[in-house]
Design a protein with these regions (language model features):
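Charged, solvent-exposed interaction patches on well-folded alpha/beta domains
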Residues: 1-140
Length: 140
């Protein structure tokens, strides 16, 4: 059975998509689904069975798929408004910078490590940057 991994805003409501980018449900309003909302880009019309081809959205879906389930439930939003600086937000409103979300699996692993470091050290953090060349936890 296909599982919703993200919800996308469309011109007429919301599309629930699986990790392949396929629309598995549409609705005029969000109902109690605990999947991240993909924001920053309005998608015209998505019908049941359509597949999303937008690269920033596809990269975001790959990133979500690469996260461990317990970490995935902490991601509430991914903003794809700037395709070169995609930002995921945790349930604690912590921005996680994903760049262009190239290497989604690597960035998912980096997210896990950096969030563990933040929790372990009880850091007060402005944002996390998952750049593989220079990962960063920016403190307040």
């Amino acid at each position: 059975e296909r599982q919703t991994v993200a919800v996308i805003t469309t011109m007429y409501g919301f599309a629930y998509v699986d990790d392949t980018g396929m629309v598995i449900e549409t609705a005029p309003q969000i109902k109690g689904v605990s999947a991240p909302l993909i924001t920053g880009k309005k998608v015209d019309t998505l019908l049941l069975g359509d597949t999303i081809h937008d690269q920033p959205i596809r990269s975001s879906l790959s990133y979500l798929k690469s996260l461990a389930p317990e970490l995935r439930k902490d991601i509430t939003e991914i903003n794809v408004g700037n395709p070169d600086n995609i930002i995921a937000y945790t349930s604690e409103s912590l921005p996680v910078h994903l760049g262009s979300a190239d290497d989604p699996a690597g960035r998912a692993e980096m997210t896990k490590e950096l969030l563990q470091e933040v929790k372990r050290n009880q850091l007060s953090v402005q944002y996390i940057d998952t750049d593989p060349r220079a990962p960063l936890v920016k403190s307040n």
